[in-house]
Structure formats: structure tokens, C-alpha cells
Swiss-Prot record:
Organism of provenance: Homo sapiens
Name of the protein described by the UniProt record: Lipase maturation factor 2
Biased composition (Polar residues): 679-691
Residue positions with a glycan: 489, 616
Annotated localization: Endoplasmic reticulum membrane
Length: 707
């Protein structure tokens, strides 16, 4: 059976990369979002209630409780955490010795600390997904690099331990929960666009931050949009159970279908690090053999296959074809696919009702839980069998201790995850074991397991709602305040900002969906613009000179609600067209009774001036200097610069690595040393006979050390 050493390494590197992007993106926005002059100052969220130190840390788990001990306020502590998090994640991405459980525990704790004070700007599903994935990385990461281990059991990768595949199975289970729930909620929401298969005729122009490619995708034929929705349901609902298929090719087919979906989303929408995180999760569907990493895999000679193996291969192929046929039949049947040869189109429609789907979901949800149980039991039994192959009583004892600890943690996390997963079907939620509910309730605040369900309802069916802020000096002549990323200027093309998430622009999209009273932070934003606070202005325009009121703050600020649509192909120089709908926020000025009432109603009034006692501490000055050096860079440029730096370092590492390591798609980097083998491999006896094997020969990768 193919191992999972390289997929695990790929997963750990991917998690490190996403943490790096997430911390760096957040760092650029902290002063405007959480600083003393920000929209929602972080210092308001951490108020000691007279509780013990450990009690308040458990109830509100954030390292920022310790910021005053370092001479920092809460926002400065958040800056320090973000900087250190980005640097540590960068190190883990480049150096294999840093892919250690302690490192990933620190990254997880730092991001959890940020989420505790992040308020509405850190309430996104991908923030929860990163926390859950980051904690799984703590279990997946090896305690010791493979190069420092003794010989592995026969038939296993060098350095493999019996328990190593167990936590990696949880990654596959998380991917299943994410995708299956995201598909199911589109139908349980009763959204007419999803049920009518017309969701993508609206999605590209109504999503939060479209890319330029979204304009072109929006103008594709309607029948292709509807067929794409059918494909989405297929990939998100029907394919995920194949993640646990015993047939390897089915798992690989499921892998490529998920990759296709995520890549298309990345091309047409700016969803920060979410799609990258999902791609990282898909590594749990891979194996060493698929990554061309099995020792000697390419040099093995074909041998005659015994009839039992041939029969098993034939049965596997027949079962595989049966699964593909069943998926094809179900798609054609339940979505009424018909080919119109004259018009060269494919017609599609939903042929089942909401009641039928609800009954199907009620019937299927609990069996998917048992599918997970069966798959986990198989992994546990496989780990036990691998343990029996360990030689030496001391190694056996060490292996059984590790297997017991990791196995218990894996089962516990699986039980915890069943509670949020069962939210997709209330009946299943009520039938879960009460012990799972108690476990989940005990650790819910740590976000070890979360419920998911993206794009539940399609918004903007009658046009994309958009809030446009305006400022004025006299209350009669108004100037629009244009944001860097969200739609505003009709002639400006949509930007490409992935993997950065401009969190204010995202919340502006949510604010436009309802009245301003549903978004209390918006009143604080208006206040900061009236006050001319530069940290907030930099969230709107990083180059302050481009802000229309950079010389003097506006006397009045108001907001209008528009409906936006993509322009038609024939309109030259225009990406958008719009229509005024209504006033979103009334015209106010500093001291205006309306503004003061709203601030008091939402608890946003400044009760005391911000403390400045930490301004002179050495650490605070270092943070201030770092900010001054990085502030001229726009956030996407900073993140792309980090990505290019990683690519450059990897390129240099590849050049300096031995030839035998270059051929591997995940060649080990600094910190992993290879030792010459002294024991012959059965498939390369002649090459091993030499005293000093050529480091560039294929046999050098298949050698083993003596016990």
C-alpha cells in the first residue's frame, strides 16, 4: 500500500504557507481595524473581570492577556503576534526541522489569540477552517525528522511510524465535512437560484470581490452556467464520499475534481486564502506513489502477476467503472440533462423536490457518519498491524505509547467534529451520542471543530447591492470615497488581491445586504473618517494622497446604496453600470445628535482617551519602526513579495541539493541530511555493491541503513 509521507509533508508546508499569508494580511490592517484610532479598538475586548489568570485564559484563550507585561497595548500585542506568526510560518515553509508539532501549536495559538479580539472582522468561515486545520497540523507534524529515525518496519517508508497516518485521516474527514456541507446547504436553504440552477448567472458579478476573469465568465451562455451548477453539486455532494473509497483511482479522481473546482474559483474570485486552504486539505487524498516518491518505484521491473491479484485488479476496475456510471446516471436523471444538437446546448433542470431532497438527506447523513467510523476503524486496525511489524521491545513500547496517545486524540477529535457536522440535518444532530455533545461543548471555544456551509444563498438577484461613502465640506457638494478593492468606480477593472483579504471591503459587502443598523461597526467607520484618522484612511486607500480628503477631513459624511451590474460587452471603457437605490446612512458631522445616538446605542463611544503608557517601551518602538518600513507597501504586493521570496529560496535550495533529491517533487531542504546506505536493496543489488554510490543514481534513493 502506498505511503503518505510526502502528502503529509506537502500538507504541513501548505498549512505553513496559509498561516504566513493570513498573519501577513492581518498585520497590514491592524492599526485601522483594531488600533486605538481604529474602527473596533481591540483593547475594548479584553477587560479583566477579577478572575484568576488561568480562568480568564481558558474562557478567553488569547496570548494577548500577556501584552501589558511586555509594555504593549492589545493592538500592539496583536501586531507582535502577527509578525512572529508570519515569520515562524515562513520558517516552517522553508526549513523541514521547523515543521514540528510545537511550531504548529504556536501558530494555532497565535491565530486563535487574534480571533478572540478580531470581532466581526475575523468571523469568517475560513478563519475557523484555518484554526481547525492548524490544530490538525499539530498532530500530523512528526516529533522527529525521518532522517533521525531508526529503520522502519519492512514494507514501509524509511522512518515511518505506525501512528503517523491516523491524524492525517482527520484531514480527509475535514475535507469531506467542508465540501459535503457546502453542497448540501445550497439546497437546504431553498435558495431559488440554486434550485433553478441559475446561481452562476448572478454569482460572478455579485460575489464580494470579483476578478477581471469574472466579467468574462459572467457573459458565458446561460446553459453553460446551469451546467456548471450541476457540476458543482456533483463535486460537492456526490464526490466527497469517494474520499474514503478503498480503490485508489477513485480517490485520485475525487482529488482532481476538487482541485478543478478550487482553481476555477481562484480564477474568478478573490477569496483570500480559503481556496488555497482547501487545496492543502486535498493532499490527504494523495499518496507517495502518485507523487512519484516511492523508493525505487520507477526502476522496478514488471513481474508476472498472480491470478488472485489479477482478479482483484479486474474487480477493482469493474467497481470503479460502476461508480463512474452511477454518478453519470444520477447526474443525468436528477438534473434532466438533455443534449440539443440543433442549438448545440445542454439543457438541465432540477427534477427532484425539496421534500425529496430532505428525505434523502435524512436517510444519508447518518450513514455518512458510519462511513467515517468504518474508515477510521480501518485506519486504527492498519496502525495496529504496522505496530506488530516493529522490531525490538523498546521500539515496540515507544511505538505503542505514541499510537495510544495519537489514536485517542484522533478518536476524540472525530467525535467532537460529529456535532458541527450534524448541523446539516437536525434529526441526525439529535441522535448523536451524548458524549460527543459533551466533548464538543467543553472545547467549542477553542474552535477545534466547526460547521461549514459556503454560498448558502445567492444574494443580489436583482443587482449587486453596494454601499458608496461620500464626503463633503459644505453639505451640498459631495465627493465619493473610493475603496481600493471593492467595486465603486465604474471604469476601474476588478482587482486581483488573492491571497490577501481586505477585511473592511469584505464587511462593506455584507453591510450592503441590510440596513446600517445591522452593521454597528459602520457607524464607527463614519466617525473615524470624520475625525480624519490615518490608520482607517489607509484601509480605504493605502496611498493616503489618493484619498480625496487627505488634506482636511470632510465635515459631513453620508452613504448611498446602489445596485451594480457588470457592463455589457459593447460598452467601451466600462466594467460596471449602476443605479441609485436609496440613502444607506444619513448625512452626519462630528457632534451630530444622530451620530452620537448611534454610537451610544452600539456602545462605541470613547469612555476614556486611549492609554499611551506603552509608547516609549523598546518593543513598542521596534514595532513602530517595523510598521513605518512596511506601510508604503500595499498588502497584496507584500504577500506576493513573500511568495516570490519563498520561490527564490526554493529555487536556490533545488540547485544546491544533490541530484537524487532534485528528482523528488518534495525534496528535503536544509536540516535533513542523507546518510550513505550500507545494506543492499533487493531491487538494486549491483548498484549497492559499490563502496561509494553515485549520489545522482536512482539507486541512492532506495537504500536503507543498518539496524
Amino acid at each position: 500500500m502506498a505511503g503518505s509521507r510526502l502528502p503529509r509533508q506537502l500538507f504541513l508546508q501548505g498549512v505553513a504557507a496559509v498561516f504566513m499569508f493570513a498573519f501577513a494580511s492581518l498585520y497590514t490592517q491592524i492599526p485601522g481595524l483594531y488600533g486605538p484610532e481604529g474602527i473596533l479598538p481591540a483593547r475594548r475586548t479584553l477587560r479583566p473581570q477579577g478572575k484568576g489568570r488561568w480562568q480568564q485564559l481558558w474562557e478567553t484563550p488569547t496570548l494577548l492577556w500577556e501584552a501589558p507585561r511586555l509594555g504593549l497595548d492589545t493592538a500592539q500585542g496583536l501586531e507582535l503576534l502577527s509578525l512572529l506568526g508570519a515569520l515562524v510560518a515562513l520558517g516552517a515553509l522553508l526549513l523541514s526541522p521547523l515543521r514540528h508539532p510545537v511550531i504548529y501549536l504556536l501558530l494555532w495559538a497565535a491565530y486563535l489569540s487574534a480571533c478572540q479580539v478580531g470581532q466581526v472582522f475575523l468571523y469568517f468561515q475560513w478563519d475557523s477552517l484555518l484554526l481547525e486545520t492548524g490544530f490538525l497540523a499539530v498532530l500530523v507534524a512528526p516529533l522527529r525528522p525521518a532522517s533521525h529515525r531508526k529503520e522502519a518496519p519492512q514494507g514501509r517508508q524509511a522512518g515511518a511510524l505506525p501512528h503517523e497516518d491516523l491524524p492525517f485521516w482527520l484531514v480527509r474527514w475535514l475535507l469531506f465535512r467542508l465540501m459535503f456541507a457546502s453542497g448540501v446547504v445550497k439546497l437546504t436553504s431553498r435558495c431559488p437560484a440554486w434550485w433553478g440552477l441559475t446561481a452562476l448567472t448572478y454569482h460572478y458579478e455579485t460575489q464580494c470581490l470579483p476578478t477581471p476573469a469574472a466579467w468574462f465568465a459572467h457573459h458565458l451562455p446561460v446553459w453553460l452556467h446551469k451546467l456548471s451548477v450541476v457540476a458543482t453539486f456533483l463535486i460537492e455532494i456526490a464526490v466527497p464520499p469517494l474520499f474514503f473509497a478503498p480503490i485508489r483511482r477513485l480517490r485520485l479522481a475525487a482529488f482532481y475534481s476538487q482541485v478543478l473546482l478550487q482553481v476555477l474559483i481562484i480564477i474568478t474570485g478573490n477569496y483570500n486564502f480559503f481556496n488555497l486552504m482547501t487545496l492543502v486539505l486535498t493532499t490527504a487524498l494523495l499518496d507517495d506513489q502518485h507523487l512519484a516518491a516511492e523508493p525505487g518505484h520507477g526502476s522496478r521491473k514488471k513481474t508476472a502477476t498472480s491470478w488472485p491479484k489479477a482478479l482483484l485488479a479486474t474487480l477493482s476496475l469493474l467497481l470503479e467503472l460502476a461508480v463512474y456510471g452511477l454518478l453519470a446516471y444520477g447526474t443525468v436523471h436528477y438534473f434532466g440533462l438533455e443534449v440539443d444538437w440543433q442549438q448545440r446546448t445542454i439543457h438541465s433542470r432540477t427534477t427532484f423536490t425539496f421534500h425529496q431532497f430532505s428525505q434523502w438527506l435524512k436517510t444519508l447523513t447518518l450513514p455518512t457518519v458510519w462511513l467515517g467510523v468504518a474508515s477510521l476503524v480501518w485506519e486504527l486496525l492498519s496502525a495496529l498491524w504496522r505496530w506488530t511489524q516493529v522490531r525490538g521491545w523498546l521500539r515496540k513500547l515507544s511505538a505503542v505509547v505514541q499510537l495510544s496517545l495519537v489514536g485517542t486524540a484522533t478518536v476524540a477529535l472525530f467525535l467532537i467534529s460529529l456535532v458541527p457536522y450534524s448541523y446539516v440535518e437536525p434529526g441526525t444532530h439529535g441522535r448523536l451520542w451524548t458524549g460527543a455533545h459533551r466533548l464538543f461543548g467543553a472545547v467549542e471555544h477553542l474552535q477545534l471543530a466547526n460547521s461549514y456551509g459556503l454560498f448558502r444563498r445567492m444574494t443580489g438577484l436583482g443587482g449587486r447591492p453596494e454601499v458608496v461613502l461620500e464626503g463633503s465640506y459644505d453639505g451640498h457638494h459631495w465627493t465619493e470615497i473610493e475603496f481600493m478593492y471593492k467595486p465603486g468606480n465604474l471604469s476601474r477593472p476588478p482587482p486581483v488581491v488573492v491571497p490577501h483579504q481586505p477585511r473592511l471591503d469584505w464587511q462593506m459587502w455584507f453591510a450592503a445586504l441590510g440596513p446600517h443598523t445591522h452593521s454597528p461597526w459602520f457607524t464607527s467607520l463614519v466617525l473615524r473618517l470624520l475625525q480624519g484618522k490615518e490608520p482607517v484612511i489607509r484601509l480605504v486607500q493605502s496611498q493616503v494622497a489618493r484619498y480625496p480628503f487627505h488634506k482636511q477631513p470632510p465635515t459631513y459624511v453620508r452613504a448611498q446604496r446602489y445596485k451594480y451590474w457588470f457592463s455589457q460587452p459593447g460598452e467601451q471603457g466600462q466594467w460596471w453600470r449602476r443605479q441609485w437605490v436609496e440613502e444607506f446612512f444619513p448625512s452626519v458631522s462630528l457632534g451630530d445628535p444622530t451620530l452620537e445616538t448611534l454610537l451610544r446605542q452600539f456602545g462605541l463611544q470613547e469612555k476614556s482617551p486611549p492609554r499611551t503608557r506603552s509608547a516609549n517601551s523598546t518593543l513598542a518602538q521596534a514595532l513602530h519602526w517595523t510598521r513605518s518600513q512596511l506601510s508604503p507597501l500595499e498588502a497584496p504586493a507584500l504577500l506576493w513579495g513573500l511568495l516570490m521570496a519563498v520561490g527564490a529560496v526554493r529555487f536556490v535550495q533545488a540547485l544546491l541539493a544533490p541530484c537524487s533529491l532534485r528528482s523528488s517533487p518534495l525534496a528535503p531542504v536544509s536540516g535533513e541530511k542523507r546518510r550513505p546506505a550500507s545494506q543492499k536493496d533487493s531491487g538494486a543489488a549491483s548498484e549497492q555493491a559499490t563502496a561509494a554510490p553515485n549520489p545522482c543514481s536512482s539507486s541512492s534513493r532506495t537504500t536503507r541503513r543498518k539496524k
